[in-house]
Swiss-Prot record:
Annotated keywords: Cell inner membrane, Cell membrane, GTP-binding, Hydrolase, Membrane, Nucleotide-binding, Protein biosynthesis
Species this protein is from: Shewanella sp. (strain W3-18-1)
InterPro entries per record: EF-4, EFG_III/V, EFG_V-like, EFTu-like_2, G_TR_CS, LepA_C_sf, LepA_CTD, LepA_IV
Location in the cell: Cell inner membrane
GO biological processes: positive regulation of translation
Name of the molecule in the record: Elongation factor 4
Amino acid sequence: MKHIRNFSIIAHIDHGKSTLSDRLIQVCGGLTDREMDSQVLDSMDLERERGITIKAQSVTLDYKAKDGQVYQLNFIDTPGHVDFSYEVSRSLAACEGALLVVDAGQGVEAQTLANCYTALDMNLDVVPILNKIDLPQADPERVAAEIEDIVGIDAMDAVRCSAKTGVGVDEVLEVIVAKIPPPEGDPDAPLQALIIDSWFDNYLGVVSLVRIKHGSLKKGDKFKVMSTGQNHTADRVGIFTPKQTDKTELKTGEVGFVIAGLKEIHGAPVGDTLTLAKNGADKPLPGFKKVKPQVYAGVFPISTDEYENFRDALNKLSLNDASLFFEPESSSALGFGFRIGYLGLLHMEIVQERLEREYNLELITTAPTVVYEVVMTNGETIYVDNPSDLPAINNIEEMREPIVEANILVPKEYLGNVITLCIEKRGTQVNMVYHGNQVAVTYHLPMAEVVMDFFDRLKSTSRGYASLEYNFIRFDPADMVRLDILINGDRVDALAMVIHRSNIRHRGLALVEKMKELIPRQMFDIAIQAAVGSQIIARSTVKALRKDVTAKCYGGDVSRKKKLLNKQKEGKKRMKQVGNVEVPQEAFLAVLKLNE
């Protein structure tokens, strides 16, 4: 056990986490050069394309150190993006230490800070590493000072390396062995193993990645999942080197996989504890908070016969993604679908893209909303995540919207732009600290504004230098109203949205204008209106197509023409009473893209 080191890498997006892990694998000979592929651990196509890490992965490497001993390094990859901070806290729970990788050109960013504090809260040893020193703009001295100043850990003798060229990678391995403590645990105690992650394999069933805290798990052992109380047999146990390699047992302190032929993912929920069926442990391991979805959206299959496939796809995906929440929903405009809860907008995009890609579904998503706390006139409090569930205005005593605390790190030349953006988003400034060239600003912002397009706008006003990290703090009373879209006097439930009263004019106008371009002309006029309660605030009309009924009249008897025109008018009026308008898919998407 003295020779085991469990660690993960914390870094901001694009600071070279995945490249560094490739180098570590290469140096330790986990894969032959032919199998070496860049970003080995980002196994999803989507991860590769966007260049981000989404799922936590693990690798076990054998490293022969300079002192002649062979160490077993268990390395758990973590995502860097704010929406996946939950995946990070899980990965950290399985480690004794973390490498804090910072880009020597860019310096510390908000994300890194947040994850680093998570690690320090869990009493992990954090080892700073300066990456990308091969770049011309690298300034390791300044960045080391920045780490000490902002994060508050000693960084003067931090290892300097370049994962791309391979410089300094050996030093990184030596530092891991020297600075990260070996696991503590009792090999003779009853088994306690933490499930770090589980995913579904079409051939093997559920594969769980576990960290053995106490005891050991052998192939063929009967074990019990503590939250469900069900017993299973371990058909296979082993490690990833990154390839799956079977072993006979996993010992205390090791990280590896267990396959027990489970058919359904919820049989081994992430963050749960495994113990032996006979004389097992009494209490589960600490270290997991159920994560709450922050953003909800309705998702519907474009053709209704895809509904079953869609449900299966969601079930499979939720095996893989512990933070996904969904429940059935039906809409008069879009048919049957699901209301899905996400951690944030990036999570939402990725889930939707994975559904469309991996399961060949065609989906349509309604505008994302956050959860509102509504106090009714009869004194009860309800939580609403769907605009069409909102009670009538006269039954609402007060509406409260979720407020987040956003920590933004930004170079000082862009500070003005960022403050302007935060004010426009109805934010209140809480704190501002200068660290050398960077400024750390703290704002309280309404979550609804943050989930819409805040991140993109923040990046564009600061030329990509600002970084953001946010968490929910409380509900605050706010003047929120529901904006309905009426088409020929009928409410379209899928287009309703909850917005602040100060935005309704501007938003309503933009919406009806946009809808006017997208709804095809019919044989009668279509009125598109935006309404709040019973008050109409904007309207536009899609004009009718008409046939030239007077074309066949020679000569000019005006009463004949009038008769024909009046007859046409009558017909249009009748049509309007019975006709119904198909709202095309593009119109729903337009609502989402309104901000751009």
